Every structure is written in C-alpha cells, then in structure tokens.
Curated annotation (Swiss-Prot):
Bias (Basic and acidic residues): 1-17, 37-47
Record organism: Triticum aestivum (Wheat)
Composition skew (Basic residues), residue ranges: 48-57
Chief localisation class: nucleus
Similarity remark: Belongs to the histone H2B family.
Name of this chain's protein: Histone H2B.2
PTM note: Can be acetylated to form H2BK6ac and H2BK33ac. Monoubiquitinated to form H2BK143ub1; may give a specific tag for epigenetic transcriptional activation.
Pfam families on file: Histone (PF00125)
C-alpha cells in the first residue's frame, strides 16, 4: 500500500534524492499547520499571509508613545513602569471622554452639528479646575495657532 504523505514532505524527499552527494538540499519555508503559501514558490505578495478580502486585525490604540515622549521632554533621565503607564493612559482616556461628552452637550445645546475649538475650549473651562483650565486653554490656543499657520 503506497504511503500517503503531505505534499511538503514529498517535495523535500524528492529534492534530497536529486541532489548530488556533498550538497545540501535547499531549505523550504515551513508554515504553521493548516497554512498554505499564498503564491507558488513562497512569494507572499501584497496580502502578507492574509486571505484575500480579510481585514487586518486592528491593534489597541493607546497614548503610551506620546506619554513617553512628554516624559522625556520634561525628565530625560526618568523612566516609567508599565503599571504607571497604564494608569496614565487610563487618565488621558477618562479626560478625553469627559471633554468630548461636555463638548457634545454644548454643541447640542447651541443646536450646532459640529464640535469646534470653541466648544472644546468651553468644555475645558467647565471640566478642569481653576489654574489648570487657564493653562490648558492657553496651551490649546497656542497649538491651534501653530497648526493653522503651518
């Protein structure tokens, strides 16, 4: 009874038989079980191993790289633990949600379909306390001016 083996094993055996003594057969790419190459001769092309029509898995978006950049601007010699980074990321997400919610309320109240920098500025004044709000507004105004001038 003939031995039924997967096609990949047959190719390796045939390559080993045909090579002259002293030369090693070319190593073939091994794929995980159940996977096949998207093109013949191992070329993956533009799909990068994904099936046609399938979407790439979206990673979780965080503010970690931006927190780290600001930390290095302020204190270049200090690091941050992963737990502290996670807390900072949660803090920024929380503030963002509060400001977005307040801005949406303001836009709805004024019967406007769009949240503009004016709604954001007002929501910053409402959400953040005293001196922190003043500083945030001045930094935000500076950032918007820089953005519009470039």
């Amino acid at each position: 009874m003939p031995b039924k083996k997967p096609a990949a094993e047959n190719k390796v055996e045939k390559a080993a038989e045909k090579t002259p003594a002293g030369k090693k057969p070319k190593a073939e790419k091994r794929l995980p079980a159940g996977k096949t190459a998207s093109k013949e001769a191992g070329g993956e092309g533009k799909t990068r191993g994904r099936k046609k029509g399938s979407k790439a898995k979206k990673g979780v978006e965080t503010y970690k790289i931006y927190i780290f950049k600001v930390l290095k601007q302020v204190h270049p010699d200090i690091g941050i633990s992963s737990k502290a980074m996670s807390i900072m990321n949660s803090f920024i997400n929380d503030i963002f949600e509060k400001l977005a919610g307040e801005s949406a309320k303001l836009a709805r109240y004024n019967k406007k379909p769009t949240i503009t920098s004016r709604e954001i500025q007002t929501s910053v004044r409402l959400v953040l306390p005293g001196e922190l709000a003043k500083h945030a507004v001045s930094e935000g105004t500076k950032a918007v001016t820089k953005f519009t001038s470039s």
